[in-house]
């Protein structure tokens, strides 16, 4: 009888998930209520496509006709990540502006700072006034890529998008209720929610009663962000369609297999596969037989996607990436997830607390835009403001560059990739690098977002 009872207890206990190291049950209020989620894989955020990472040769795929020598080939590894299938459209950005207008109704400067610069269409010797007035807002252009957005504005949009997606996920999971009365001083952000500053109205998720979602629940997603240069180039090439037995069977010059610019599909033979400038004065071809069919950007879902399913990774608009520009980054950056532009920030736990940093390690380690290129490690001066000063490091790290006199490169120079509707074929190669200041904008530059992939490296 005792043996039978033991079996019954054992069978009953086996149905309850328990710790393999302590034996205590999970999800049991009587044991303290340590909750583990049934979710094991990351939720795929709206608009994203899984990009399975791997090793590839990053850098020039064409002859360097401009002799810039800023993208010499080298082998690197990129971790798996997610990326927007299309460029961010005018409609997507108008949704952002609408939210800001509603929440920051008493702060018009916030809204004004987020608006695209429509004057980027203006040209002293070209009639583009209609584009200034209607391109961003008219419904005819709602599916066209947003332009006139600076690198800073693109980052702000990505942060806003992260919060709106996470807010919707919490609402769908029953962890939060809708709140259409959010204000500048009280609105949902992921950080505010996790810190307990924004509470909303939570609902029950376990038997203990109401509680907020946590990272451990697997509901909240990582931040949307701009892709790194390496991620963008890797995704644009789409070599996953050219691999066999752990080898790349054929390198690509462009995001498509052919070294030409026209489709070899029998149904579309001779059609251009991207939106670009064919030659001087030829933006779309001849009436009755247009080639790419667009004098300006085309809708974000146009032409053919690459092997990852991404649209317009060559042509249409160039795209901002996360990196700070340096012509010799390929010599400096790591061979795993290469990136220049790290800024390490510490959370503020209490005000009026002075950190004792007598050996200046915190200041020197946090600002890595210039690492090995004008930073503390690479300085040749034994005594200067950077090594002895107590002010913000970014004020002194640019000493290596005399910006405006000897160079246009600074800590505010950001990379943008890919050709645009106004560029020739050379710029359609994903390896080509260009840069602008992070607060500048152009009628030829847009952006798309990316997100870290958590867990398995396999694309799902």
Q: PLM features: what roles do these ranges have?
A:
Residues 43-60:
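Mature N-terminal segment immediately following signal peptide/propeptide cleavage
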Residues 11-33, 37-39, 64, 137-145, ...:
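Disulfide-stabilized, aromatic/cysteine-rich ligand-recognition loop
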């Amino acid at each position: 009888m005792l043996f039978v009872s033991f079996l019954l207890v054992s069978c009953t206990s086996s149905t309850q998930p328990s710790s393999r190291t302590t034996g205590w049950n999970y999800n049991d209020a009587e044991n303290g209520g340590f909750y583990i989620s049934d979710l094991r894989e990351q939720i795929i955020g709206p608009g994203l496509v899984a990009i399975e990472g791997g090793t590839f040769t990053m850098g020039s795929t064409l002859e360097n006709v401009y002799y810039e020598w800023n993208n010499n080939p080298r082998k690197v590894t990129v971790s798996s990540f997610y990326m927007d299938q299309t460029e961010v459209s005018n409609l997507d950005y108008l949704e952002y502006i609408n939210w800001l207008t509603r929440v920051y109704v008493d702060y018009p400067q916030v809204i004004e700072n987020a608006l695209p610069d429509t004057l980027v269409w203006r040209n002293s010797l070209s009639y583009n006034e209609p584009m200034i007035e209607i391109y961003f807002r008219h419904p005819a252009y709602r599916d066209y890529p947003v332009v006139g957005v600076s690198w800073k504005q693109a980052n702000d949009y990505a942060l806003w998008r992260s919060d709106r997606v996470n807010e919707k996920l919490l609402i769908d999971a029953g962890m939060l209720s809708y709140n259409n009365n959010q204000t500048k001083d009280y609105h949902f952000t992921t950080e505010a929610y996790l810190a307990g500053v924004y509470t909303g109205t939570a609902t029950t998720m376990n038997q203990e009663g109401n509680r907020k979602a946590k990272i451990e629940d697997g509901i909240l997603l990582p931040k949307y962000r701009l892709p790194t240069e390496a991620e963008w180039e890797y995704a644009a090439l789409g070599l996953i369609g050219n691999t066999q037995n752990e080898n790349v069977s054929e390198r690509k010059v462009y995001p498509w297999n052919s070294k030409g610019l026209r489709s070899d599909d029998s149904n579309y033979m001779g059609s251009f596969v991207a939106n670009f400038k064919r030659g001087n004065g030829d933006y779309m071809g001849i009436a009755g037989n247009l080639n790419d069919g667009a004098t300006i950007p085309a809708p974000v879902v146009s032409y053919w996607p690459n092997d990852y399913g991404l649209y317009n990774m060559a042509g249409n608009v160039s795209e901002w990436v996360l990196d700070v520009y340096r012509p010799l980054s390929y010599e400096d950056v790591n061979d795993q997830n290469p990136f220049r532009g790290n800024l390490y920030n510490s959370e503020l736990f209490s005000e009026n607390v002075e950190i004792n940093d007598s050996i200046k390690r915190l200041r020197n380690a946090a600002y890595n835009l210039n690492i090995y290129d004008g930073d503390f490690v690479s300085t040749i001066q034994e005594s200067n403001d950077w090594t002895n000063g107590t002010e913000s490091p970014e004020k002194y790290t640019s000493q290596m560059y005399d910006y405006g006199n000897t160079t246009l490169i600074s800590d505010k120079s950001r990379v943008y990739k890919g050709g645009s509707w106004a560029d020739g074929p050379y710029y359609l190669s994903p390896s080509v690098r260009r840069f602008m200041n992070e607060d500048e904008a152009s009628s030829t530059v847009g952006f798309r977002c990316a997100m870290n992939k958590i867990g398995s490296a396999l694309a799902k």
